[in-house]
Amino acid sequence: MKKIISLLVCMFLLTSYSITAQKYKRKKQQNTTQFEEKYYDAMQWRNIGPYRGGRSAAVTGVANKANLFFMGATGGGVWKTTDAGNSWENISDGFFGGSVGSVAVSEWDNNVIYVGNGEKTVRGNVSSGDGVWKSVDAGKTWKHIGLKNSRHIPRIRIHPKNPDIVYAAVLGDLYKSSAERGVYKSINGGLSW
């Protein structure tokens, strides 16, 4: 008798769950806005860049400038757009290239940009980098400011009111022990860590 009651309770619970799920699915479908195909059938996809960038996991915007974004590519340096992505310009060529794991722009002074080299997506084949780079003129020029053997820097954070205070999360060598690994702090704009 206990088995029959248990079986009936289970069937009841499963049935009520199924009914609830169907109601939710129908409700969700009713709220979907659909547009007639004539409004978008002439549209065509196009690549707006950046070109030769490779994959990217390092993208940041600038809080008070809605159309300004920076992107760090795994195989193509740092790119900048001032028109919300319609066009891109490489701003690191001639200074550094290769793999970028993080890009940070100061909220206090948008001309100050820090870049951490080295891919941050840990995979079988990753590109390493050579530390932290800094620009004080919105990417026109760059200076290497340390952590040369860090290899992979997935995150950089800048103090919101003082661009000289910066933190860098450093992975170091992914496949063996590494002297440069951990969270580093600079209080002098990267002169020392």
Regions found by a protein language model. Name each.
Residues 1-25:
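Bacterial Sec-dependent N-terminal signal peptides
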Residues 17, 22-193:
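Beta-propeller blade termini and top-face loops
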